[in-house]
Amino acid sequence: MIVLDTNVVSESMRPRPDASVRAWMDAQIPSELHTTAINEAELRIGVALLPKGNRRKDLLLAINTALARHFADRIVAFDSAAAVALADIVEHRRTIGRPISQFDAQIAAICKARGATLATRNVADFADIGLKLINPWSAP
């Protein structure tokens, strides 16, 4: 299982996604690509905070379409196993002097609880957690 972080999902929705990201995604088995409910929330919050108008409506439609088309049954929820992992991640990152944002900690916890790889551009944000990370912008 590969979990796509918000920046990867967002990039894939662009009219002209980065060539490296597109090539990396095309090389993956679609059924292995997932995202989380936390990533969905980040996307929806980003749109909800935009001024009302056509751009906001168009982006919301694009998110709804992308999630339904590409992740219909592959949006991973935050569950009890993730809650246990979350506590460990937050404690560890504070102990080493590198606090982590709540959303990133929740995404990392979901991945850790399921043994999933995380695909993200922000690899530094998820360092020192013990996750396998892939940066599609620089993947071979």
Task: Indicate where each model-derived feature is located.
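Residues at the C-termini of beta-strands that transition into short coil/loop
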Residues: 37-39, 79, 137-140
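Short, structured coil segments at secondary-structure junctions
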Residues: 29, 71, 129-130
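Acidic, PIN/NYN-like endoribonuclease modules and their adjacent C-terminal/linker elements
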Residues: 1, 106-140
